[in-house]
């Protein structure tokens, strides 16, 4: 179920403050955050936000298509190693 329109999007206050200060100073350094739950606002477009995935910070360059999504959607927490395959069939191909 999605969030009520009357409530508005959720963004952590400390992240908004960091984005506004980066905009004022024309700072291009990545903004480091642990807030995966924050919604991407139009103010974030063009900035690089380093989102923590539980192990490291993954740089996410915010584009226009990302507005309305959560930051955590672009910083995966699990590494996909691939599905198990038939090793006999894979080895016999030439």
From Swiss-Prot:
Belongs to the universal ribosomal protein uS19 family. PROSITE patterns: RIBOSOMAL_S19. Pfam families: Ribosomal_S19 (PF00203). Residues 83-94 have a biased composition (Basic and acidic residues). Residues 75-94 are annotated as: Disordered. One of its GO terms (biological process) is translation. The keyword Ribonucleoprotein applies. One of its GO terms (cellular component) is cytoplasm. Keywords: Ribonucleoprotein, Ribosomal protein, RNA-binding, rRNA-binding. One of its GO terms (molecular function) is structural constituent of ribosome. The gene is rpsS. HAMAP family: Ribosomal_uS19. Protein S19 forms a complex with S13 that binds strongly to the 16S ribosomal RNA. This is Small ribosomal subunit protein uS19. It comes from the Bacteria. InterPro entries: Ribosomal_uS19 (IPR002222), Ribosomal_uS19_bac-type (IPR005732), Ribosomal_uS19_CS (IPR020934), Ribosomal_uS19_SF (IPR023575). SUPFAM superfamilies: Ribosomal protein S19 (SSF54570).
């Amino acid at each position: 179920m999605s969030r009520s329109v009357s409530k508005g999007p959720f963004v952590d206050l400390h992240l908004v403050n960091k984005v506004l200060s980066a905009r004022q100073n024309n700072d291009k350094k990545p903004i480091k955050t642990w807030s995966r739950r924050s919604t991407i606002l139009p103010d974030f477009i063009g900035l690089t936000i380093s989102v923590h995935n539980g192990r490291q910070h993954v740089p996410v360059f915010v584009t226009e298509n990302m507005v309305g999504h959560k930051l955590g959607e672009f910083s995966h927490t699990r590494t996909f190693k691939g599905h198990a395959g038939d090793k006999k069939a894979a080895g016999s191909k030439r």
